[in-house]
């Protein structure tokens, strides 16, 4: 992180530094960040100060999944849509949006679960190459399953469509940062889960607490790995 280390705090997480580094190297001109933690808010401030992103947007992520938060989140997503339409000159394609949903395959075979902080594609491939069993990415980058009914979405007006989208987004397996993350216990109780590789990242405390809880209660083999 040669460039990002010059303008970011030394204790900023590696993911945050990698985002800043990519912007400074000219690899990213359009960026949507989610204010899921203090690090991402600092990344937004730093990237904004550089002036190197043509489109920069901070998406406000709720920490609850009640009805009020769903309505609020739907409005937030619509504002992002409108902001990008104004920037790009393109119009939101409802057909492409609805067609992008696919029915996920249900895994009924024994597998090793990767939990914790998001894993990069390189790290995920390395884990798969070295484990002689199916590997399921259960972090926020791999466990994205939305329960949508496409036929119903075709007839929805924009406001209803985005409310439905916000509903299913917040109805997913919750991130550990959510105020009510108890549903994450389902991940550990799956009878097909035969082991856990738990990924943490330096200077990110959230998932250290969950790891301690899993280590105390889980009955399958558990391996903790930490990256920068």
PLM features per residue range, with description:
Residues 1-228:
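An N-terminal assembly and electron-transfer interface module characteristic of large anaerobic redox
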């Amino acid at each position: 992180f040669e460039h990002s280390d010059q303008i970011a705090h030394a204790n900023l997480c590696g993911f945050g530094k990698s985002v800043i580094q990519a912007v400074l190297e000219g690899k990213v001109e359009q960026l949507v960040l989610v204010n899921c933690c203090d690090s991402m808010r600092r990344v937004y401030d730093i990237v904004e100060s550089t002036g190197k992103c043509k489109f920069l947007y901070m998406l406000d992520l709720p920490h609850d999944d009640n009805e009020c938060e769903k309505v609020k989140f739907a409005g937030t997503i619509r504002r992002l849509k409108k902001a990008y339409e104004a920037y790009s000159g393109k119009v939101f394609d409802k057909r492409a949006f609805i067609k992008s949903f696919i029915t996920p395959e249900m895994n009924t075979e024994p597998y090793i679960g990767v939990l914790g902080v998001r894993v990069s594609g390189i790290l995920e491939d390395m884990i798969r190459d070295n484990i002689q069993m199916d590997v399921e990415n259960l972090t926020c980058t791999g466990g994205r399953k939305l329960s949508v009914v496409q036929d119903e979405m075709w007839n929805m007006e924009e406001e209803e469509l985005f409310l439905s989208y916000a509903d299913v987004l917040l109805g997913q397996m919750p991130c550990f940062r959510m105020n009510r993350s108890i549903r994450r216990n389902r991940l550990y109780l799956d009878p097909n889960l035969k082991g856990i590789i738990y990924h943490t990242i330096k200077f990110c405390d959230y998932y250290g607490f969950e790891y301690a809880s899993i280590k105390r209660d889980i009955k399958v083999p558990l391996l903790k790995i930490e990256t920068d």
